[in-house]
């Protein structure tokens, strides 16, 4: 495995969605690690130290906003960029995410492979700039 591969943690309660993200981003050289739900996701972020987190909002054990708040409250996680990937497609949800919570990007399901890839590359480019 190349050392310069960007590591992405995908926190999602649907294994099929994790597999889809792994397929899309894996083809472009990203290393994707999946977490089934928020609690597992936080533990995985702590262990893996990813370059980026893809975060679902609606999960049964701990919702995405709670995961995001815990990340931003921790010194070792607060600088990791977060892209929300959710079925919550109403404009108010997007405004809350991008302008109130200040997530790095907000993608609604269903999404196209190119949309996901462009978002990930844009956010990572902004962080490394």
Give the positions of each predicted feature:
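C-terminal output helix
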Residues: 110-121, 128
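Receiver (REC) domain active-site loop signature in two-component systems and cognate sites
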Residues: 59
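Helix N-cap/capping motif at the beta->alpha junctions
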Residues: 34-43, 64
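Active-site beta3 strand of CheY-like receiver
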Residues: 48-54
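Alpha4 helix (beta4-alpha4-beta5 surface) of REC/receiver domains from two-component response regulators
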Residues: 22, 66, 89-106, 118
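Conserved acidic carboxylate
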Residues: 12
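Charged docking surfaces used in two-component/phosphorelay signaling
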Residues: 19-27
């Amino acid at each position: 495995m190349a050392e310069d591969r960007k590591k992405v943690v995908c926190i999602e309660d649907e294994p099929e969605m994790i597999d889809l993200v792994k397929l899309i981003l894996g083809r472009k050289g990203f290393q994707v690690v999946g977490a089934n739900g928020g609690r597992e996701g936080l533990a995985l972020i702590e262990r893996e130290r990813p370059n980026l987190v893809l975060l679902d909002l609606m999960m049964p054990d701990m919702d995405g906003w709670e995961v995001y708040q815990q990340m931003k409250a921790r010194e070792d996680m607060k600088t990791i960029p977060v892209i929300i990937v959710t079925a919550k497609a109403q404009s108010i949800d997007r405004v809350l995410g991008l302008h109130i919570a200040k997530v790095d990007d907000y993608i609604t399901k269903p999404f196209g492979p190119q949309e996901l890839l462009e978002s990930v590359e844009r956010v990572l480019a902004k962080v490394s700039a």
